[in-house]
Amino acid sequence: MTEKRVEQLESRVNDLECQLAFQEQTIEELNEALSQQQMLITRMQDQMKFVVGKVKNMDGSNLADASEETPPPHY
């Protein structure tokens, strides 16, 4: 191989190594973001289950019967 060809190959290898390093960093950052989002989704699902449970356990005794309601002022 000629000296020029060896330099070209070394340059290409260096470029590929740089690209690989950046890709590895990007993958790590994406993995961290995904992990945080999954934790947030899990927390939100737990909160939603809690709220749904509260709503299901509410009784209608706080609501007045329609016949007991006073008519609105424009009546």
Curated annotation (Swiss-Prot):
InterPro entries per record: SlyX (IPR007236)
Origin: domain of life: Bacteria
Gene3D superfamilies noted in UniProt: 1.20.5.300
PANTHER family with a match to the protein in the record: PROTEIN SLYX (PTHR36508:SF1)
Family: Belongs to the SlyX family.
Official protein name in the record: Protein SlyX homolog
